[in-house]
């Protein structure tokens, strides 16, 4: 069987696709898998690193804010749309896939359109609680629409019923053990670990609120802090020191630029403060963590807000919109969770109840079924 995956732009699109491709490769070692993406985005590194073949097309997204610069970019995008149609058809003719799967990002558009016009079975997966423009348009034509959360179903006008699959979670997250992780981080019984992060770049609003939280609660009995400041947050340690905290010698505060052992840190945490990207929320659900979510307002269709509300509406998270985020507001919410164990645990239990830890195998099963039917 031959599988062609289209995913690009961000890790939120690429990593779930890689997880499913890995599942197929493990169960069907004789299968052939090809990814299609762009040469200058994240997929051009992540896909080859995962050991999959990779083909490129020229494509970019439309700029919605109309400026002279963006109008020029949109004209170039129109040209790319025409050329990418020829590129994708050639890739499909050469590879001859049994099924084509799109995981979002603008690269999915031309690949899936070419595939369904050529009569090849197609499927898409929507990671967010509000669909992207590309997936919404494709849903009317593809054979299967797979969704991460139930609340997104109403936004799709698809020719087939949407299938609820969840979102694949990394294996190391599912294997993480809370007691082992807390012992590794030297967290004592009764201590509450507050894990805060604003992504690999470092969201300014989260960094500023976290600085106030850590500075004002540095000596609060039973509080432990681990904060990821990101690439653009290197000012954070100096600001905490300016606020009178002896950061180098403080036993209960750790500041990192990036957290590479997220499985250990998140499994050890009692409270997680973060953005509301789909992958992060699936991990929070899988580990059953109480979370305070600050959706990014700078994403397409404001989808992080919808992602967060899917949990909030089930009593599985607390939301603070970025426009409402202050140090004092974050302190209030953290204090309430840190000092109220039963509330913290209830939110975590509600989050765990939303987890779909078999998402990877479920998606792979659907995709393989389409491939087998194409051969029948």
Q: How should each PLM-predicted stretch be described?
A:
Residues 3-10, 30-83, 198, 231, ...:
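Conserved nucleotide-sugar phosphate-binding/catalytic loop shared by glycosyltransferases and other
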Residues 13-24:
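Short amphipathic alpha-helix
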Residues 46, 178-180, 187-272, 305-309, ...:
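Donor-nucleotide binding loops and adjacent catalytic segments primarily
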Residues 53, 116-179, 187:
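Active-site-proximal region of nucleotide-activated glycan assembly enzymes
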Residues 87-100, 107-123, 136, 140:
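Glycosyltransferases and closely related glycan-assembly transferases
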Residues 97-99, 259, 263-282, 289:
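Acidic donor-binding loop of glycosyltransferase active sites
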Residues 343-357:
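A short, well-ordered alpha-helix in the C-terminal region of glycosyltransferases
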Residues 357-376:
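C-terminal alpha-helical cap of glycosyltransferases
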């Amino acid at each position: 069987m031959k599988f062609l995956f289209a995913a690009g732009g961000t890790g939120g699109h690429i990593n779930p696709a890689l997880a499913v491709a890995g599942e197929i490769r493990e169960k069907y070692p004789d299968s052939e898998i090809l990814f299609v993406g762009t040469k200058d985005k994240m997929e051009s590194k992540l896909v080859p690193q995962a050991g999959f073949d990779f083909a490129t097309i020229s494509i970019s997204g439309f700029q919605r804010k109309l400026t002279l610069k963006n109008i020029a970019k949109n004209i170039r995008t129109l040209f790319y749309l025409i050329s990418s149609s020829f590129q994708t058809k050639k890739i499909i003719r050469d590879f001859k896939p049994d099924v084509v799967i799109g995981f979002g990002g603008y690269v999915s558009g031309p690949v899936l359109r070419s595939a369904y016009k050529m009569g090849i079975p197609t499927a898409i997966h929507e990671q967010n609680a509000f669909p992207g423009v590309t997936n919404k348009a494709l849903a009317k034509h593809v054979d299967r629409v797979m969704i991460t959360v139930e609340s997104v179903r109403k936004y799709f006008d698809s020719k087939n019923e949407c299938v609820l699959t969840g979102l694949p979670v990394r294996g190391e997250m599912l294997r993480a053990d809370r007691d082992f992780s807390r012992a590794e981080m030297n967290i004592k019984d009764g201590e509450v670990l507050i894990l805060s992060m604003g992504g690999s770049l470092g969201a300014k609003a989260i960094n500023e609120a976290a600085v106030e939280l850590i500075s004002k609660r540095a000596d609060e009995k039973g509080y432990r802090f681990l904060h990821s400041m990101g690439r653009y947050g290197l000012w954070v340690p100096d600001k905490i020191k300016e606020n009178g905290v002896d950061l180098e010698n403080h036993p209960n505060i750790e500041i990192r630029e990036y957290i590479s052992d997220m499985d250990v840190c998140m499994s050890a945490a009692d409270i997680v403060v973060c953005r509301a990207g789909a992958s992060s929320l699936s991990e929070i659900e899988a580990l059953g963590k109480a979370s305070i979510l600050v959706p990014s307002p700078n994403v397409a269709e404001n989808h992080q807000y919808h992602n967060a509300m899917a949990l909030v509406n089930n009593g599985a998270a607390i939301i603070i919109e970025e426009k409402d985020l202050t140090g004092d507001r974050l302190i209030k919410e953290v204090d309430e969770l840190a000092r109220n164990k039963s509330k913290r645990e209830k939110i975590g239990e509600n989050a765990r109840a939303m987890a779909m830890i078999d998402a990877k195998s479920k998606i792979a099963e659907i995709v393989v079924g389409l491939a087998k039917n194409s051969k029948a």
